[in-house]
Amino acid sequence: MSTFTAKNETVQRDWYLVDAEGKTLGRLATELARRLRGKHKPVYTPHVDTGDYLVVINAEKIAVTGKKLQDKMYHRFTGYIGNLKTESLAQALERHPERVIEIAVKGMLPKGPLGRQMYRKLKVYAGTEHPHAAQQPQVLDI
């Protein structure tokens, strides 16, 4: 008997709906990354994308512990000399709350083409509305 290897064509990918309201950012991101990789499935294969599609709603109501709202900083560089832009977690949640979850999850996925493919299956929305009703996502309680 040989070791089982999942094939990209035969992998069953489901759609799940996750409500981020009141969830801790890091704990939620860890579970989302695990499910995007497919590590919760018995057919998990490291070099094949076996993960599911995840629709996250209420990103604006995510919770953090301690003083991270003021202390946690996000940095981005515009490409021009001296233009390193910095904003706190509180400012980031005001401007673009969905990006906070996306950045946290992206850092937990593999770097490279396979990780980018897994990341594309994550859909994050600030409010309760999302355009994926046609996929009939199942509610996932994390």
From Swiss-Prot:
- Give the highest taxon in the source lineage: Bacteria
The major lineage groups are: Bacteria, Pseudomonadati, Pseudomonadota, Gammaproteobacteria, Lysobacterales
Q: Which Pfam families match?
A: Ribosomal_L13
Origin species, per record, is Stenotrophomonas maltophilia (strain K279a)
What GO CC terms are in its UniProt record?
Answer: cytosolic large ribosomal subunit
Q: Which gene encodes it?
A: rplM
InterPro entries given in the database record: Ribosomal_uL13 (IPR005822), Ribosomal_uL13_bac-type (IPR005823), Ribosomal_uL13_CS (IPR023563), Ribosomal_uL13_sf (IPR036899)
Q: Name one GO molecular function term.
A: structural constituent of ribosome
Full protein name: Large ribosomal subunit protein uL13
- Family that this chain belongs to: Belongs to the universal ribosomal protein uL13 family.
Which keywords are on file for this protein?
A: Ribonucleoprotein, Ribosomal protein
Q: Which PANTHER family does this chain map to?
A: LARGE RIBOSOMAL SUBUNIT PROTEIN UL13M, RIBOSOMAL PROTEIN L13
The biological processes this protein is annotated with in GO are: negative regulation of translation; translation
Q: How is the quaternary structure described?
A: Part of the 50S ribosomal subunit.
Functional summary from the UniProt entry = This protein is one of the early assembly proteins of the 50S ribosomal subunit, although it is not seen to bind rRNA by itself. It is important during the early stages of 50S assembly.
